[in-house]
């Protein structure tokens, strides 16, 4: 009666199902009256564009809709776009990469390109190649170190190419090879993956899609290197992995172009 009087369209259930705790009779009456009944995880996913780790549970991930990126048609369409777009991009990018490589060499000691092992789809390792933007002794102690905002290890040329995202242009070759996609979660180092997987749930599920040059987390969350930052970015990565569509990829690419034109959030 209250739902009808107040013209309620949706009821969001924030309770976990426990014996004698869920008002099943009331919910059934509301649902049969035409009111949509939703639970909190689905509601937050829809309203925030991320999977809320505080409310989600394994059964929700198993039984809710999504995770269609592995279907043959979706995977084929995404791969076809990646191959065509990366092939086209590499043609004008080649002279830019070459010129930038010379500037990197003149600016600081060390190689022009930076190679590093990253974790790809389904946990498979691959070698990522970027134009070097930090000093060659950035990790001289041999331990993986999180990059920081205004990191003092970044060179003069490195600061510019990071702001313009030129350092990431060589990754188009990884996309053409099929190790990466244009859109997907950020590829992390194995050391960081091992560390984060022990501290937050469902971290491995972000690897059901290929890592990307840009992604849903990158355009929705500012750069950060703390554990809390990683948790928030994981929520966006899980949303992308669960809700992938070609339209979502197009939206992310358009937002990435906006960031390139107005690079106020460059790391």
Q: What feature does the model see in each segment?
A:
Residues 16, 41, 95, 111, ...:
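Proline-centered helix-kink/hinge sites
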């Amino acid at each position: 009666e209250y739902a009808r009087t107040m013209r309620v369209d949706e009821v969001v259930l924030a309770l976990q199902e426990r014996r004698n705790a869920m008002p099943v009779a009331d919910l059934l009456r509301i649902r049969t009256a035409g009111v949509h009944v939703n639970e909190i995880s689905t509601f937050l996913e829809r309203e925030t564009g991320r999977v809320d780790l505080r409310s989600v549970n394994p059964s929700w991930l198993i039984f809710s809709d999504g995770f269609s990126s592995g279907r043959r048609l979706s995977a084929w369409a995404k791969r076809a776009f990646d191959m065509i777009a990366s092939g086209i991009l590499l043609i004008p990018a080649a002279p830019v990469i070459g010129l930038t490589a010379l500037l990197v060499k003149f600016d600081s000691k060390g190689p022009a390109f930076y190679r590093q092992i990253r974790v790809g789809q389904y946990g498979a390792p691959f070698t990522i190649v970027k134009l070097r933007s930090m000093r060659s002794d950035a990790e001289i102690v041999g331990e993986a170190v999180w990059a920081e905002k205004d990191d003092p290890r970044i060179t003069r040329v490195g600061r510019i190419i990071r702001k313009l995202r030129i350092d990431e242009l060589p990754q188009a070759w990884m996309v053409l090879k099929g190790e990466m996609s244009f859109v997907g979660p950020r590829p992390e180092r194995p050391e960081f993956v091992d560390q984060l997987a022990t501290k937050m749930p469902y971290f491995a599920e972000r690897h059901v899609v290929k890592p990307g040059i840009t992604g849903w987390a990158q355009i929705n969350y500012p750069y950060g290197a703390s554990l809390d930052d990683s948790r928030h970015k994981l929520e966006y990565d899980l949303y992308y992995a669960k809700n992938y569509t070609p339209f979502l990829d197009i939206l992310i690419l358009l937002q990435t172009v906006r960031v390139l034109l107005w690079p106020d959030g460059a790391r």
